[in-house]
Each structure stands twice: as C-alpha cells, then as structure tokens.
C-alpha cells in the first residue's frame, strides 16, 4: 500500500514539474509599458539631429504597416548623408516580430548598398548595427551607441 502511494506521489510530482517547466518556456509573453521602454531607449540613443518618423515613412523604409503593430517608434537622421536610425517595435505576434526583424535586416543591407564606395563611416555604422528580437519586441539601431542602446533595451524588458 505504501509503495502504491509513494509511486503515485512520484508521478504527481513529475507531472507538476513538467507543467512548471512547460509554463516557464511557453508561458505568456512578457509585456512592459512601451512608453517607458521607449523613453529608456531614447534617453541613451538621443534625439539630437533626429526626426520622428510617421506611418508613411515606416512603410516606405521597412514595408511594415504601423497600424498592424501594437506600438512602434521610429527615429531617422535629419541629414540625408547620415545613417543613424532607431526603430523600436512592439509586435502583435511572434510571427510579426520575425517579419519586422527581417525588414530591419533588409533595411540595413539596403543602406549599406546605398553608401558602399563613398561612405565608409556610414558603412561601418551599418556593419555594427544592432537588430535584436525579444518576442514581442524588436529593436533596430544604427548608431555609435548601438550597443549601449541594446543594453538599455534589454534592461527595460
């Protein structure tokens, strides 16, 4: 009788452990206050020489419809010869986060091609850009402070 109870207890504990581990890896996605995350990232990135992009610019540069995203923030350089850029996105789904990441990769590659041959400083910044996907958030940064912005982004999550 004790053996049966002990065996049953082991099975229940194992089942509980499996449920706990599954919950950790497949639980609900983290959600943070986007305005706070944006502020923390923006503070490190800075806004001097930058302009905020609208939904039309987001679509033109990334092929992404801003109305389909949960939240987004885009900064681009005021100077056409500068490549500094920041895109912070809260996506509505994991699939969408992957699409935004791919769009950021394509944007970086397009910019490299645009500046190849006559803009070595710009190409170097693009080579060192940060594209970070932390479901449901995506960060794209082209800046001398890209790693610092990434750190602020990860800390804010």
Where are these predicted regions, by residue range?
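Short extracytoplasmic/periplasmic juxtamembrane "stem" segments immediately C-terminal to an N-terminal membrane anchor
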Residues: 36-53
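Extracytoplasmic/periplasmic/luminal assembly and interaction segments
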Residues: 55-99
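A short, solvent-exposed beta-edge/loop patch
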Residues: 121-157
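N-terminal positive-inside, membrane-proximal cytosolic segments immediately preceding the first
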Residues: 1-7
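Aromatic-capped interface at the extracytoplasmic side
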Residues: 25-36
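Structured, soluble extracytoplasmic/luminal domains of envelope-associated proteins
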Residues: 80-126
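Hydrophobic membrane-insertion alpha-helices, especially the h-region
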Residues: 7-24
